[in-house]
Each structure stands twice: as structure tokens, then as C-alpha cells.
């Protein structure tokens, strides 16, 4: 609630780094005064451009977007480190978290992921 007691709308920008067009839209949304915070995706292809844009817009609050799925067909994400228990045969994250009968074997929960491997990979960073 705002100071007047009226509800307050908070808008958070999402997926910075995903695509060039997403980066442009995120920064435009911030510069237009619509939002003041963004989530950046370090695993995304346009992450380097996103970092450059963030440096040019120091007033933008930044958070990390945790990515462990890669649901789009033509845009894929993969881990920053070697973590094969979370990836498919091509090294990309699985497209969904939970099983879907229409897409057998395509969820993380159907795989034999190794928490020790994940912990070791995260400790390297």
C-alpha cells in the first residue's frame, strides 16, 4: 500500500539478456519511468550487451534471474558451468520443470540430476 492507503503497482522488468530486442525494451521501459528494477539472465546470449546497458543506466536496480529450464524452441539456454545432470543430450536445460504426458522425458524432474554435482559446479564460481 502507498502512503495514501491506495494500492501501489510495482513493475519489475524481466529477461534482460535474452535477446537484443528484449534488452532494448527493458532499457526503454526503465528510461520511460515505467519500472526501476530488472532481472538479468547470465546464461543468455545477449548478456554481454545487457551488462553494457546496465553500466549506462546505473540507477536501474538489478537482480538475477535464476534459469534452470529452456522452454523456447529456437532460443536455448545452457549452464555457465559443466553440469550435465541438468541438461539434455545437446547441453541445453530441459524445457520444463515438471512432467507433462504430452512431452515425456522433457522435464528436469524426470531426470537423474545429481545435487552433489550441482553443488560442486556452483562452488566453482
Language-model features, listed with the residues they occupy:
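CE4/NodB-like, metal-dependent polysaccharide N-deacetylase domain
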Residues: 116-125
